[in-house]
């Protein structure tokens, strides 16, 4: 059944202490008058964790009272190890200051301000406050935050949400000793402007909400901007939503994405080893859980108020992209402009609105696919670790990874979970299936302690090895509408879990240990020297990805990823006219194309069409680009045919310049027909334009 992306009559938005947005409830369901959970530490008991390890998923995802986790060791496992160990210096005032108010969190559930004399009136102040991303019982950072009408500092900044045509009046005050520049509090059809707010200054701002869409406002120190790594001014961002005459839609979540840095490099720039990504002020696992029923339509507005790219990925389903915008403009798509996607790239300062109608129950992740932004949360402020302490922690934790604690110890940052409740009597069907194998090797030698996980693919008695032993793995070729079983054979000494990126399948098989599945059947790790059967029936032909979703730090960088191609009924994969290009990271070549920097030439014939499938599953290269140069060294043309495995509608299948950004977790399919003989060059380029890998197409004339 094809997903419906309209408002269902049964849709309902749960906002009670035991509902969709009950992220601030205490253990007994208590919610304080200001919407915060009790701060007596009572909701920090271990019952949820004990239940989680025992396999009771209801206590993890569906119980909103277990949202702050005890004993979350900051496990700087391996990615920070791969970063340069730069000795950063602490920001002034990063230790807890008991004299400062504490930043309160909210999820943009209500608009701030009220109507006064025909204007929507809103008071905003800026003040110093303590921000505790892991709860008030943990160390915090001294930050600047916008305040609500009652003077409380909040993150994100108070949401301004009005109907188009509303007159807005904002009172700004700055009682601090710093100068701030405020952006975004203005009409959208005017020339972009800003407000300089000096220490002790107050300003009155009036404008009309003259354009419908997803916008935002933000403040920075004088001389700073949104696209640089920010420190104590990094949480000064808020949503500004302008609805149509009908008002706000149901079941919508407005999410502000932020990155905060805790220390600087010697040259004064932000140290990425102290970067923390937050959704509405909190990182995973402190982000709210959303709970819906089958048939509900769920809407998201994402605002990238940070300095980096965020490819936002939904597990197990497609969402519809309804708009794309930025600070001063938003393109709300008409029906023929809308498209389906599983990963949407957001550049710094960009916004988007998405609609998802879930068709399968279970636990699903929605997260940034930039690996840096979902790694374990770093210790902040007084809990900060020195480089020496990091090395010691890595040595102590080597080989001690516990898959049952993966959701707590190995995941963090820009990630949230959505629970789709199964209807009464729901079961997974089990038709006769084609049998495939994904075989992970036991690859260790006395001279190499760093294992390679690059898998082979088995179909019957045949076992297809990867092209290179450093990744990617051999491609999996499936058939549309054919029930298929993929048996993961883990011959390695470490547990793993395989995610079928972009595939529409049951949550239990999605590959996220501790999140996937339904009560009574929880996704578990594929333990060493054991197997796991993943079942799927691909509803569409296209280009997808398989990759590890457990201990990604070690396994993704050592080859545990590959292409997953679904062919239409009656068609076989033809490698002479169908070409897979997967961008990944290897130990020898770093970011590469099919594991190589220089690929062997392809022999093509002028006038014959070829399908080029591009996949980005690198760890940190969210801004890679694919270019195809013609025989005259200028950019040639190709035709876009699919995005993330979903065929584009006919009116979007157009010839365009052969240049395409491909962010992490995205796939793109193009049809290329060389019109003239000669030497063409397919290039993988870094964001700065430097060529990272390439392959020549040697095109001969048709005989």
Which stretches of residues belong to each language-model region?
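Bacterial N-terminal signal peptides
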Residues: 78-88
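Surface-exposed interaction/gating patches
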Residues: 258-320, 348-360, 582, 586-631, ...
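Extracellular/periplasmic metallocenter environments
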Residues: 175-182, 186-249, 338-425, 493-496, ...
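Asp/Glu-rich intrinsically disordered low-complexity tracts
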Residues: 6, 12, 18, 22, ...
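Bacterial N-terminal signal peptides that target proteins for export
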Residues: 69-80
């Amino acid at each position: 059944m094809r997903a419906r992306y309209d408002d269902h009559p049964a849709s309902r938005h749960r906002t009670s202490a035991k509902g969709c947005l009950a992220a601030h409830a205490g253990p007994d369901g208590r919610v304080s008058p200001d919407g915060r959970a009790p701060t007596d530490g009572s909701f920090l008991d271990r019952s949820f964790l004990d239940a989680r390890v025992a396999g009771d998923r209801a206590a993890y995802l569906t119980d909103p009272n277990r949202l702050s986790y005890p004993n979350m060791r900051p496990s700087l496992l391996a990615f920070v190890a791969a970063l340069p160990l730069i000795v950063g210096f602490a920001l002034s005032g990063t230790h807890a200051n008991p004299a400062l108010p504490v930043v309160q969190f909210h999820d943009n559930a209500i608009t701030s301000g009220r109507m006064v004399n025909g204007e929507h009136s809103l008071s905003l102040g800026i003040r110093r406050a303590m921000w505790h991303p892991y709860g008030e019982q943990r160390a915090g950072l001294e930050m600047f935050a916008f305040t609500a009408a009652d003077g409380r500092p909040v993150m994100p900044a108070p949401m301004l949400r009005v109907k188009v045509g509303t007159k807005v009046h904002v009172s700004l005050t700055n009682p601090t000793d710093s100068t701030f520049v405020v952006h975004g509090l203005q009409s959208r059809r005017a020339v972009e402007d800003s407000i300089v707010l000096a220490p002790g200054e107050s300003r009155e701002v009036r404008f009309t909400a003259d354009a419908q869409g997803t916008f935002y406002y933000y403040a920075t120190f004088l001389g700073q901007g949104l696209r640089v790594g920010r420190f104590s001014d990094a949480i000064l961002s808020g949503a500004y939503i302008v609805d149509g005459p009908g008002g706000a839609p149901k079941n919508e979540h407005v999410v502000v994405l932020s990155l905060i840095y805790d220390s600087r490099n010697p040259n004064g720039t932000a140290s990425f080893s102290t970067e923390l990504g937050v959704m509405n002020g909190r990182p995973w696992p402190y982000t709210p859980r959303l709970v819906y029923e089958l048939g509900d339509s769920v809407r998201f507005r994402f605002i990238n108020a940070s300095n980096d790219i965020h490819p936002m990925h939904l597990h197990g389903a497609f969402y519809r992209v309804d708009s794309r915008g930025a600070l001063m403009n938003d393109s709300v798509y008409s029906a023929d402009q809308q498209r389906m996607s599983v990963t949407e790239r957001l550049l710094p300062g960009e916004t988007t609105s998405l609609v998802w109608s879930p068709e399968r129950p279970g636990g699903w992740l929605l997260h940034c696919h930039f690996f840096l932004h979902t790694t374990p949360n770093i210790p902040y402020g007084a809990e900060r670790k020195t480089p020496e302490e990091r090395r010691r922690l890595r040595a102590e934790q080597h080989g001690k990874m516990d898959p049952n604690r993966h959701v707590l110890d190995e995941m963090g940052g820009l990630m949230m979970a959505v629970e789709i409740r199964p209807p009464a009597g729901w079961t997974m069907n089990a038709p006769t299936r084609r049998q495939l194998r994904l075989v992970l090797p036991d690859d260790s030698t006395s001279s190499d302690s760093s294992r390679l996980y690059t898998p082979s693919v088995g179909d019957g008695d045949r076992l297809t090895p990867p092209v290179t032993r450093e990744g990617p793995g051999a491609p999996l070729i499936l058939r549309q509408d054919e029930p298929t079983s993929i048996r993961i054979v883990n011959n390695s000494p470490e547990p793993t879990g395989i995610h079928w990126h972009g595939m529409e399948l049951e949550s239990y098989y999605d590959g996220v240990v501790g999140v996937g599945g339904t009560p009574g059947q929880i996704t578990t790790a594929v333990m060493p020297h054991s197997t796991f059967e993943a079942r799927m029936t691909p509803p569409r032909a296209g280009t997808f990805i398989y990759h590890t979703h457990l201990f990604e730090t070690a396994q993704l960088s050592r080859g545990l990823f590959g292409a997953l191609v679904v062919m239409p009924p009656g068609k076989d994969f033809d490698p002479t006219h169908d070409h897979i290009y997967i961008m990944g990271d290897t130990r020898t070549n770093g970011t590469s194309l099919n594991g190589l920097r220089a690929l062997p030439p392809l022999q093509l014939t002028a006038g014959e069409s070829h399908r080029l499938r591009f996949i980005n599953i690198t760890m940190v290269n969210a801004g890679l680009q694919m270019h195809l140069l013609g025989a005259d060294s200028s950019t040639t043309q190709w035709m876009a045919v699919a995005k993330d495995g979903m065929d584009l509608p006919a009116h979007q299948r157009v010839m365009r310049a052969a240049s395409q950004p491909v962010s992490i977790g995205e796939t793109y399919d193009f049809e290329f027909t060389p019109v003239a003989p000669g030497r063409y060059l397919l290039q993988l380029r870094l964001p700065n334009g430097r060529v990272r890998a390439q392959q020549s197409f040697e095109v001969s004339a048709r005989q």
